[in-house]
Every structure is written in C-alpha cells, then in structure tokens.
C-alpha cells in the first residue's frame, strides 16, 4: 500500500456530492448507517446531504434536502428508527415524481445517492438510475436545467444498504435492524415464559416479517419453542395432529409451558393463511390447555439498536461511501451486504431478482426452492430447528456411544444454550450424554452425571454456566482424568469455553503419548466474552458482553451530555484482547479505544487530549474513551484519568468507570443463543462421525491431529481446525491469536471520531455475484 494510495481516500470525494435517504419501513441501526455515510463522506472531502422523509423528500425538494455537518449526526447512534424520517412514497413510482427528484438533485450537483431501505426502495432507486439520462434530456428540453448542469450530472451512482427488520433480502446474511428486532422479540418471549410457567399456559406468539420467516425461525431457535410456522416451509397436511401430539409430549416430559411462534405470513401447503387465532382454537379444542395469543406488532421495530446493528450500519455506511466514490458510469448499482463477517458488494438487480424469485417460488408452492433461495444461513437454521423440535430421541441405546460435555474457563452468556443443543442432538443420535461439573477439575474428581432430555430444558435463555466452570487445566490430573474416562466409558469430549478450553485441548493432545485413555476425539466450542480463542472470528458470549458495555456507555454518554464538558474513561474486560474495547468503541461512538494490539505512547495520549480540547469548542461537549484492561501495564486507567484531568483543567473534567464482571452476566442475546445452539449441533454431528471412524476392536482410539479440533467461524464458514495446527497462530504469553480480523475496523472508529488518519482502501469489498455466494460455503 503506497502512501499515495493511502492519501487517495482523503481526496476521493473532493468536488463530489452524496445524498443519503432512508425509505420504507424504519429499522434500528439506520441512524448508524446515516452517521457513517455523513462522516466518511465529509472525511473524503465530499459534500453530504440529508434527504428527509425518504423519496417523498427527494420529490418535494426544498428544505427536505439539507447539507449535513459533522455535528448534525452526533448523538444519533443509539437512537432507534431513523432521525431523517422515512415515508412510503407514491409520487416516486410515477415518472413525473422521478423527474422532479432528478431536478432537485441536479440543481444541487448531487450525483451520488445512498439509499437505506428494503427491496422496494432499492428497486425504485435502480429504476431511477436507469432512466437518469432520459430524465435529464426532458429537463433540458423543458429548459429547467442548463446544458452545463446536465453535463456535470451526466450519470447517477447508486448504492443500496438493506435496512429491514424482516431480513428478507437475498444476498446478505443480515439486514440492518434484524438483530435489534430479535432483541425486542426475545425480551418479550423471556418475559412471557415466566408467566406461562406460573400458570402452565400455552402461548401463541405472532411475529412480524411479511413473507419471510427469518424472525420467527431464529426466535424459535433462541427460545426453544415447541413449534414454528413460517411461510417458506408450510407444515404437512396433518399438522394439527402432529402439533397436538408434540405439545402433550412436552407436557408429559415435565414442561410447564408451551410456546408456539407464528410468522405473520404463515400458510399451509395450499397457500391458505394459518393465523394465531386458528392455532389457539385448535389447542383449546383438542387439548383443553389454557392458551393465550400475543401479537408483538410494532414493538419489534422500536427501541435502541443492538451493538450488532450499530456496527453493521457503521461498516456498511463506510463501504457505501467508498462504492459511490469509486463508481464510474459503467458500474452497476450495487448493494453493500454482509456475508459471514465480510462486507461484500453485490449487483442490486441480481439481489432484487433472487428476492422476487423467492416470492414467486412460494406462490407456485415450490417451497423447497424458496428455502434454497433464502440462502445457506436460513437453511442451517431450519435444519437445526427441525432436529431439536421434531425428531424424537430413540428409545433403545444399543450401539450408542458416550459423549461428555463440559464448560472450561470463565462464565460466558450462551454456554448453557451450547450445552443444551449438544446434549439434545447427542440424545437424538442415540448416544449417552454425560455432563461434567466444574470443568477439568470435575472430570478429575468424577463430578459426572448422565443428562436426559429434560435435564437441559429451558437452558437456552439462561446466562452464565449452569454446569459450573473452572480455569483449571487438565495436565496436573491426567491420571485421575484417565481413570474417570475409563470408569464412565467416555468416548468423546465436547469442551465449551475460552482460551483455557483451547490450551486444555492442547494438553490433552500432549497427554495422548502417555495415556491411551486420552486418545478420544474432542472438540472445543469457543465461549468467552474476550473473543480471544484462536481459530474463530467470534466466540459465544462476546455479543452479550458487547451489548452490556454498549448499554452502559449510552447511559454514561447521556450523563455526560447533561453535565457538558465531561470526558468519561471506561475500562472494559478482555484480558489482552482488544475486541470488546474496539467493537464497543464503534458501537457507542467513542473518541478513542486503547488496546494492547495497537501499541500507543504518551504522545498518542497527548494527541487524544488535544482532540478532546478541540471537540469541547464545538456543540458536542462530551467525550468517551474506552480502555482495554491490559492494554498497557504502565498507562493504567488511573494514569489516563489523572493525565486527562490535569491536561483538561479548565476545559473539561474527567470521570472513570471500571465495568468489571457485569460484562460476563446477563441473559444471552439472540445472536449468542443462536450461534451457541448451532455450534453445539454442529460439534455433536462431527463427534458422532469421528467416533465411528475411530472405533477399532471394540474401543475408541483416536490419536490423529484432526481428532482434536476447535470449531470456529472463519469469514464465511464454520470450520473444524486441529488444535495442533492453531498452535503456530497463537501468542500464548498474551492469550490471543496472532492475527485478528477486527483490527481492520480500527480506522473506521478513528475516522468516525474525526481523526485525520490515512484510510487503507485496499481491503474494501469488490463486486461479487450472488450466484457464487449462494453456492459457496454458507455462514452460520
């Protein structure tokens, strides 16, 4: 990367103008995207305009199109909805309306349009672009614009960001707003669960999503619902019979409640709608259960955006500006979307076409095709749901294997969800599943018991670790561990935990040379708030911790905004890993985030103080600085606080907050529940396969490197990687992987906080095609 290229990003937008609008239904996280578009646009030297009230504002012009400033997008990151307003616009559907919109853009010299909305809004934008030259011709003929203006605005660049709570847009794994909508739904489901258990009730919950069952499907996975109705996969013709049998079976197993999730577009095989009332009447009539219906409605669109949506919106906004400014008359209108944790650019019309194909397939009752078109992520969710909710464990355990599940390290939200799915998938496969209490220590002491189906009932939504977890490593107690492996006939180990789970795995590999009993397959599922396990881009529990930090930062910023001229220094957890500090910095709009991976000196601290001094001269009179707990042994939180207090005398005062163990607590977020559930299922499927492969002469013998793995999410796929192969990628002294993907997001944090830095554009997304993405390895 040459210095010239580095510098190019800062001058990329000079002489250009970008307009940003939000259209269609609002979604949480739209404000994060608007803020990123405005700030990165200004950073590149472009002028940026707000278009208020969506396409209606574009058509009406006047005060609806206003130039944005750096400060005009301050304090909007944590707000739900869209601050610049949205409207469903009839005028823009007519050519006359689009002509007026073109006139309003040309007069302001705007040739770049960033549209944040659903598929309808994006299709409208593409139509507008394809007609652009004709519209200019008409305006010239009518004498409304000069030839010079027409030449200057000869082509229109369009980039779309998908903002929709339904996640119904093909080509992106997550749309802006989906994660926050899931947060709202899960909060409600958790609240309803307690009342349902008290009265032994059945609840039928109707969630939004139009013709897409994503919200309903993920909700049912995240709360362990008994049944889900989604439009893409209508139930079989005798579903009434199956549903009632399933509900009464659950009650027989000792459950005090039933939860049924219905997508608002749910239909049967003949395309006839299935309503919540129909289901309620059926359950009351056939089973006589006390049944209530709750329609969640617009609650799902409201509230604060989750950390995931704020980061997604910010990343997509940055990418959108780059795509617009790099655009030429020949580049097609594109959508910036998410694949795994990678930002990708896809041709807008290809995505719209596939989205329409889903609707068409459903109308033609080709449900299998509709499911495939929704993408790998959707299909994986559906497969895991079907296994957990509809397959019964076999009665006989003949030819079964024994697998033990344990937690290692510090507690992390989502551990219990991973244990639940591991245990249940194991039972479904006909295995005996044992649970080990208190990690490797419990394995050595024999704190082991068999788990049945209902042992893990209701665990998905519970935080912490119900099995108990310890940081103890196995090496010291190999003899006792080997004895217990023989005593309980353990043939495979699923280890759910943080860095200790990984190092424990390495020790088990080492111990195989001495103890034959340790020659059994094992798999590590990364679960730690620090997100520092080699071999995985994400760990179970990190998303929950991130949201906890985010909520706290929002409250602290609000306090600072009230007092004025105040800077807060907040210390986050994570050991030496700066993931939480960096991502929370992005999600909470921090001015700086100090981390171990990016060494800093006293000069950097001084520069940050200078930066805050300048900031206090603007209308935004507050500061937020995050510091990872082990970023530097000498520049402690107290040191930074004292430095800021001294240097800021008379200009701002400082306060400090150490967040501590609250970051490990709380009920798991939908992302962590879902991720943990799928990781558990995937791990158990792998385990069954490898046990069969390692079965020789009546016993298990696994001593190959690939029989001890970490299951991790890498870019776009879930992969099993031998722990021994990951050794070279690990910095053991600081307990972090040598390469971390999220470090590439650090410059975004600095630009959004108004630092003059060089932006490396070499890693920006390139245009891909949707067909390739669908056939490639899917994300979780």
From Swiss-Prot:
Modified residues (Phosphoserine): 133, 377, 667, 775
One Gene Ontology molecular-function label: 6-phosphofructokinase activity
Name of a matching Pfam family: PFK
Enzyme class name: transferase
Primary location: cytoplasm
Active site: residue positions: 166 (proton acceptor)
EC number: 2.7.1.11
Signal peptide region: none
Binding positions (substrate): 164-166, 201, 208-210, 264, 292, 298-301
Protein name: ATP-dependent 6-phosphofructokinase, muscle type
Organism: Macaca fascicularis (Crab-eating macaque)
Gene for this chain: PFKM
């Amino acid at each position: 990367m040459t210095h010239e290229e580095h510098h190019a990003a800062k001058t990329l937008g000079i002489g250009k103008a970008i307009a940003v609008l939000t259209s269609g239904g609002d979604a949480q996280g739209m404000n994060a995207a608007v803020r990123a578009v405005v700030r990165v646009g200004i950073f590149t030297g472009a002028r940026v305009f707000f278009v208020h009230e969506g396409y209606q504002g574009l058509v009406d012009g006047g005060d609806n199109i206003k130039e944005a400033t750096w400060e005009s997008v301050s304090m909007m990151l944590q707000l739900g909805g869209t601050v610049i307003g949205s409207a469903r616009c009839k005028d823009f559907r007519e050519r006359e309306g689009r002509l007026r919109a073109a006139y309003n853009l040309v007069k302001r010299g705007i040739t770049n349009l960033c549209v944040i909305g659903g598929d309808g809004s994006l299709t409208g934008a593409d139509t507008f672009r394809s007609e652009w030259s004709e519209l200019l011709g008409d305006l010239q003929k009518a004498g409304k614009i000069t030839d010079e203006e027409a030449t200057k605005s000869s082509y229109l660049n369009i980039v779309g960001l998908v903002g929709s709570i339904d996640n119904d847009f093909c080509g992106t794994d997550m749309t802006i707003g989906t994660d926050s909508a899931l947060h709202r739904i899960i909060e409600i489901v958790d609240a309803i669960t307690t009342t349902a258990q008290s009265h032994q009730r059945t609840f039928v919950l109707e969630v939004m999503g139009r013709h897409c069952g994503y919200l309903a499907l993920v909700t049912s996975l995240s709360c362990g619902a008994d049944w889900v109705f989604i439009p893409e996969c209508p139930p079989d013709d005798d579903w009434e019979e199956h549903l009632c049998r399933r509900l009464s079976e659950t009650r027989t197993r000792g459950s005090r409640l039933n939860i049924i999730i219905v997508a608002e577009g749910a239909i049967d095989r003949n395309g006839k709608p299935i309503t919540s009332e129909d289901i309620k009447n059926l359950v009351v009539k056939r089973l006589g259960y006390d049944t209530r219906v709750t329609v969640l409605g617009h609650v799902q669109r409201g509230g604060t955006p989750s950390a995931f949506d704020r980061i997604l919106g910010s990343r997509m906004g940055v990418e959108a500006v780059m795509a617009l400014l790099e655009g030429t008359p020949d580049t097609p209108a594109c959508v910036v979307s998410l694949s795994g944790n990678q930002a990708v650019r896809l041709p807008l019309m290809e995505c719209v076409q596939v989205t329409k194909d889903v609707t068409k397939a459903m109308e033609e009752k080709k449900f299998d095709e509709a499911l495939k078109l929704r993408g790998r992520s959707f299909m994986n969710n559906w497969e895991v749901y079907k296994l957990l909710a509809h397959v019964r464990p076999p009665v006989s355990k003949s030819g079964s294997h024994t697998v033990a599940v344990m937690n290692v390290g510090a507690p992390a939200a989502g551990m219990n969800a991973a244990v639940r799915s591991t245990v249940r998938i194991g039972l479904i496969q006909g295995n005996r599943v044992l649970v080990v209490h208190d990690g490797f220590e419990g394995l050595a002491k024999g704190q082991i018991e068999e788990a049945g189906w209902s042992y893990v009932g209701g665990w998905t939504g519970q935080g912490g670790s119900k099995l108990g977890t310890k940081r103890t490593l196995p090496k010291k107690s190999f003899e006792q561990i080997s004895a217990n492996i023989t005593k309980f006939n353990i043939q495979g180990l699923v280890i759910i935990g943080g860095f200790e789970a990984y190092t424990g795995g390495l020790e088990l590999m080492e111990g195989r040379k001495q103890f034959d009993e340790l020659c059994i397959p094992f798999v590590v599922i990364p679960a730690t708030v620090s997100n520092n396990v080699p071999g995985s881009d994400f760990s179970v529990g990190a998303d929950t911790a991130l949201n906890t930090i985010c909520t706290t930062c929002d409250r602290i910023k609000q306090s600072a905004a009230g007092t004025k001229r105040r800077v807060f220094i907040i210390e986050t957890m994570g050991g030496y890993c700066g993931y939480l500090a960096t991502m929370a910095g992005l999600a909470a709009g921090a001015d700086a985030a100090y981390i171990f991976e990016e060494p800093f000196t006293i000069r950097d601290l001084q520069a940050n103080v200078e930066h805050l001094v300048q900031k206090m001269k603007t209308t935004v009179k507050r500061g937020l600085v995050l510091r990872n707990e082990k970023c530097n042994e000498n520049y402690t939180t107290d040191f930074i606080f004292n430095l800021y207090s001294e240097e800021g005398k008379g200009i701002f005062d400082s306060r400090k907050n150490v967040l501590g163990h609250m970051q490990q607590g709380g009920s798991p977020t939908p992302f962590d529940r879902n991720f943990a559930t799928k990781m558990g299922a995937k791990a158990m499927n792998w385990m069954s396969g490898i046990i069969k492969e390692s079965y020789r002469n009546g016993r298990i013998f696994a001593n190959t490197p690939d029989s001890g793995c970490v299951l991790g999410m890498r870019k776009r796929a879930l992969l099993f990687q031998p722990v021994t192969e990951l050794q070279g990628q690990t910095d053991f002294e600081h307990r972090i992987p040598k390469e971390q993907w999220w470090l590439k997001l650090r410059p975004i944090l600095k630009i959004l906080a108004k630092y003059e830095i060089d932006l490396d554009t070499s890693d920006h997304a390139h245009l891909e095609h949707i067909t390739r993405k669908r056939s490639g390895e899917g994300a979780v």
